[in-house]
């Protein structure tokens, strides 16, 4: 009887050990990280550097697959339909989960079909005055916009972008009306901003850095978790008592829903080690990116809150996709 009990215990221990081993990420399969944007942008750079570090640290075969289309919805849907075995991951900003589904029908339910794993980087958004707007600071902008409703034209990378939704939230919070001018990307907005066609630019901060340095543009505030090292004098919107308008591109890793807790924890641990790696930290510094905003439930809660608040802002302002 004792022999049978010991044998059963041994078999159980072996089974448990096998199960625990199966929970380790990355496992035997190659890992495909889908980036739902064209090559060359911030997400692509983050994905490739993160992939390089993960290869070195875990021995995994990491493949970066750019799959743009449908406002980043195409690549996002591919991951949402994948098996939750850790072999297919999404690297994207939170926008395909928290903004896009409120603008158009998607084939995935962002709150049901995808699991936030970790925020890996933040791309700050800058609110910058052009030569066409004579104000000294953010308070001056709001005062002018209140006294001259719709007179201030602000250029963004496009309708339904983080910058657009963030400015809608800002205008609602400050009762300052301004006119949105959507462009097709940061570069087009910058060109018109430098030419004085618009009074204000709301674009990724790295796009305007040289023009701020030359004096052609003046930063009034940043949408970011913390101040930019290159602009230590420029406040964040949270510091200006406008946390509800604190919008920025929060890049994260997402997995198909249904991943086991053990596998999720193993993946999160691998990502945390990779983000602490000097090579990855070097990319953040040189690209003027900030560290991610959280891992696991911390990040998941942020995504849920964004999804809910964006639904209200987009509906209240009748924001449409391009």
Residue ranges and their predicted role:
Residues 27-30, 239, 261-322:
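An extracytoplasmic/periplasmic, membrane-proximal ligand-sensing/linker region
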Residues 22-112, 151, 175-200, 211, ...:
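N-terminal (or domain-start) structured segment
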